[in-house]
Curated annotation (Swiss-Prot):
Phylogenetic lineage: Bacteria, Pseudomonadati, Pseudomonadota, Gammaproteobacteria, Pseudomonadales
Protein's UniProt name: Ribosome maturation factor RimM
Principal localisation: cytoplasm
Chain ranges of the PRC barrel domain: 97-175
Family, similarity comment: Belongs to the RimM family.
Length: 175
């Protein structure tokens, strides 16, 4: 039975074909990159369309993965899979240590500074060379209408309360 769409987590994206035997090139959002290959059953999603796929094999190829899906044996057929997000049920993600979070858990949290001012909500995160960056967008009740980029570091993030939907930060609202 397929998993409801709101219970899915995107772990990668099919970006193009690979070779002539129906393999696809995959950009992985997992760390390390080849962790995506641990999941054999994929839910593929693109423009509201959902389909199921089964991974037969895959390998790391530079900064992307080459993957063979069951029943996909032709380059032109593989091309039709380009652009699909690769999703798995949240329940299949491994448990994390205390104080560690998946990005999807942080998205949507209200961001509050030390003075109690609402800066906005975390829209998404960016991976940079030094540290991850939270993109905080204004929301109803926020201090102003500015978008902010905050580092996801121990120095900036003071506390995270998933149940309350809040993150407390040490951040000057003028930045």
């Amino acid at each position: 039975m397929p998993t409801p769409a709101d219970d899915l987590v995107v772990i990668g994206k099919i970006v193009s074909v690979y070779g002539i035997r129906g393999e696809v090139k995959v950009y992985s959002f997992t760390d390390p990159l080849d962790n995506l290959l641990d999941y054999r059953r994929w839910t593929l999603r693109r423009d509201g369309e959902i389909r199921q796929a089964e991974l037969v094999r895959g390998r790391l190829h530079g900064k992307v993965l080459a993957a063979k899906l069951k029943g996909l044996d032709d380059r032109e057929e593989a091309r039709t899979f380009t652009g699909y997000e690769i999703c798995i049920p949240r329940s299949e993600l491994p448990s994390l240590e205390e104080g560690e979070y998946y990005w999807h858990q942080l998205e949507g949290l209200k961001v509050i500074d030390q003075g109690g001012q609402l800066l906005g909500v975390i829209d998404h995160l960016l991976e940079t060379g030094a540290n991850d960056v939270m993109v905080v967008k204004p929301c109803a009740g926020s201090l102003d209408d500015r978008e902010r980029l905050l580092p996801y570091t121990g120095q900036c993030v003071l506390s995270i309360d998933l149940a309350a939907g809040e993150m407390r930060v040490d951040w000057d609202a003028d930045f």
